[in-house]
């Protein structure tokens, strides 16, 4: 009986690394009573790579949006596919809805403010997560920050450094029993592998870096981790019901899908989603 157990102990970490699967395994709440049989079971939570954490999705329209909402998207292009492969995620881009049909984002053309119509046109799939307790004043400050750095460059160096980091950080998922270990491990690798730019010296951003900085400037940080460490997938996993690599200040709320995308539509067709 000893050998099979040893094999399982070796295979489980290997499976987690190869599949880039982040897992949380935790004991039940200490407040649960001893007679509560169900509470004695261990809680196992897997990271959701899809754009939704439940089997059903909610389709929304533009009037459902609020200033400060996060717009996550992917396209059918090669670049989007590559980002999704390396980040083992269903998203490759994140932007901020400013209100009045305007969107702030950082793309290869730099930091821009574009129409929501244009942002939707360039996306195959687009869904919305909301930051809890964001005030109108903070939303206004996010818009002011976007206008201030508009036409700044794109952080190509940060993206190049991010590619090996996204691979090596998967090692931090090998211990599924400690959320603190995983977050400290990822932060340690980020410090070792990624460049650090002083706040006043920053002249360029990639998409999730811009989003993270915008909320920090508004006094409502999404996470205390450095913005240059954060990918679109990291922000997506900060939602309720998911497992995040970096600790969120507050978990994001799923609002709905503006565009389901071809994969979700195909899943509906064969009955995998609804």
Placement of each model-derived feature along the sequence:
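Sec-dependent bacterial lipoprotein signal peptides
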Residues: 1-19
């Amino acid at each position: 009986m000893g050998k099979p157990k040893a094999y399982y102990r070796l295979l489980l970490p290997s499976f987690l690394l190869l599949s880039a699967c982040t897992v949380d395994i935790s004991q039940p709440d200490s407040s649960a009573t001893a007679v509560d049989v169900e509470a004695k079971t261990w809680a196992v939570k897997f990271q959701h790579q899809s754009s939704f954490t439940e089997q059903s999705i909610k389709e929304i329209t533009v009037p459902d949006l609020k200033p400060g909402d996060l717009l996550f998207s992917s396209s059918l292009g090669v670049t989007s596919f590559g980002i999704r492969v390396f980040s083992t995620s269903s998203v490759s881009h994140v932007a901020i809805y400013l209100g009045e049909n305007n969107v702030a984002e950082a793309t290869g053309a730099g930091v821009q403010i574009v129409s929501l119509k244009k942002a939707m046109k360039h996306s195959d799939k687009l869904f919305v997560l909301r930051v809890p307790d964001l005030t109108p004043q903070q939303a206004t400050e996010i818009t002011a920050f976007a206008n201030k750095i508009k036409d700044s460059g794109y952080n190509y160096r940060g993206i190049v450094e991010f590619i090996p980091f996204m691979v090596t950080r998967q090692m931090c998922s090998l211990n599924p029993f400690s959320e603190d270990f995983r977050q400290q491990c990822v932060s340690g690798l980020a410090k070792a592998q990624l460049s650090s730019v002083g706040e006043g010296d920053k002249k360029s951003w990639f998409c999730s870096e811009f989003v993270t900085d915008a909320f920090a400037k508004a006094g409502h940080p999404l996470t205390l981790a450095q913005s240059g460490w954060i990918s679109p997938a990291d922000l997506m996993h900060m939602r309720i019901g998911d497992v995040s690599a970096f600790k969120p200040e507050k978990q994001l709320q799923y609002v709905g899908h503006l565009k389901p995308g071809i994969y979700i539509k195909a899943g509906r067709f064969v009955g995998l989603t609804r």
